[in-house]
């Protein structure tokens, strides 16, 4: 299948992402997707599921990140499950997220998603893996990571977090080595630690 229409859809998210170009929106229909991971989204692409209750993405390698995002990416309306420490559902690439096209940085945007796992992390923002403001933007993300971490920001990375709800996490929101998180309209239920900060930036 060439992935250009619903009747000719790619069978995997990774397959669809492999042909995506800047400006592409990939529609993910309801179902459970076990994917070869990590899947790296090109800059300025969007991955949009039918609904977070009906689209579930699971990694074939549970200790590796599920998605790596670049400048201007968006992921919406899906549940991530099965990733375990040290993996995150969403992170910057292992190389670096460059400022494609120049100008101001447009952080990856994660909206209306759920991370449902054990020791894994929902979002890991490592400032050493991106440029400019080294940031991601989050709206409506539930983190049900039992014994894991909701959002981790390190190495002078930056997170704008709105409506992030953590349940049973060992650490809900954590910042290290100069990382910064702006947090609004969010809460931490159960779990061990709510807000954790340590270390200093360069």
Report the location of each language-model feature:
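Short glycine/acidic-rich loop motifs that flank beta-strands on beta-rich extracellular proteins
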Residues: 36-38, 52, 58-64, 83-94, ...
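Short, surface-exposed connector motifs at secondary-structure boundaries
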Residues: 20-24, 143-144, 165-166
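Non-transmembrane elongated oligomeric "stalk/shaft" segments that connect baseplates/barrels to distal
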Residues: 10, 15-16, 104-105, 123, ...
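Beta-propeller domains
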Residues: 160, 168-169
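Nucleic-acid-interacting cores, centered on viral/eukaryotic replication and modification enzymes
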Residues: 149-151, 157, 164
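Extracellular beta-strand-rich solenoid/capping regions of secreted or surface-exposed proteins
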Residues: 14, 21, 34-48, 55-104, ...
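All-beta strand scaffolds that present successive hydrophobic residues in beta-strands
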Residues: 28, 46-49, 73-77, 100, ...
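Acidic Gly/Asp/Thr-rich repetitive segments characteristic of extracellular carbohydrate-active
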Residues: 1-29, 34
